[in-house]
Design a protein with these regions (language model features):
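A short, Lys/Arg-enriched interface patch at domain edges and termini
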Residues: 128-185
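Polyanion-binding surface elements
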Residues: 77-103
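Major-groove DNA-recognition helix of helix-turn-helix-type DNA-binding domains
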Residues: 93-123
Length: 191
């Protein structure tokens, strides 16, 4: 068993967590979490013992969602979306070094494409799981399989949580989008 640290951000109907809510989380198995709230956002910082990161995160999600307080997990942190500055900080490089890797002016090339652009389109964000996978190939001595899997699991769990929220929508637009994209999803998953 290893110890894994992560934060679950969750939504709950109440304006704040009561002592009874905290007791319910504890009784559901959340004794290894520190619960907090800031600006209407609820979170739980877990230090969870488990065989692997997936087991740790899934068991923690189950604690939050089965405690009987109406909580629904919306994401796991640390966040998978990173800027050049975040990549530099997490890899121990300078911003300029990362920029050169991103632009293919240093390293082997093939740096992952940005996942999105924010603001006026100048600020790019990458999926950290993709970046770690690239670094694992580029610098295998610094990035082992376990850290690569850790970030991949967190990214996939977050994607599942986003998809779950979308799948629960029943308005006409959501139904039309799901129906229209189903063939594309089937083609993509068949590859």
């Amino acid at each position: 068993m290893k110890s894994y640290e992560f934060r679950l951000v969750f939504d709950v109907l109440a304006a704040e967590l009561s002592d009874e809510d905290l007791d319910a989380f504890y009784e559901a198995g959340g004794g290894d979490a520190l619960f907090g709230q800031s600006a209407g956002v609820f979170d739980a910082d877990f230090t969870r013992e488990a065989a692997d990161i997936l087991e740790a995160v899934v068991s923690a999600i189950n604690v939050i969602e089965t405690a009987g307080v109406g909580a629904v997990v919306v994401r796991v942190e640390p966040d998978d979306q990173v800027s050049i500055g975040d990549i530099a900080e997490r890899t121990g490089r300078t911003n300029e070094s990362v920029r050169l890797l991103v632009n293919g002016q240093r390293g082997p090339g093939g740096f992952p494409m940005p996942a999105t652009r924010v603001g006026t389109g100048r600020s790019r964000l990458w999926r950290w799981a993709d970046v770690v996978e690239w670094f694992h190939e580029y610098e295998p001595d610094r990035w082992d399989e376990e850290s690569t899997r850790y970030w991949s699991v967190l990214a996939l769990v977050n994607e599942f949580l986003r998809q779950r929220a979308f799948a629960c929508r029943v308005d006409e637009t959501a139904v039309q989008v799901r129906h229209a994209l189903s063939p594309a999803l089937e083609r993509h998953c068949a590859v």
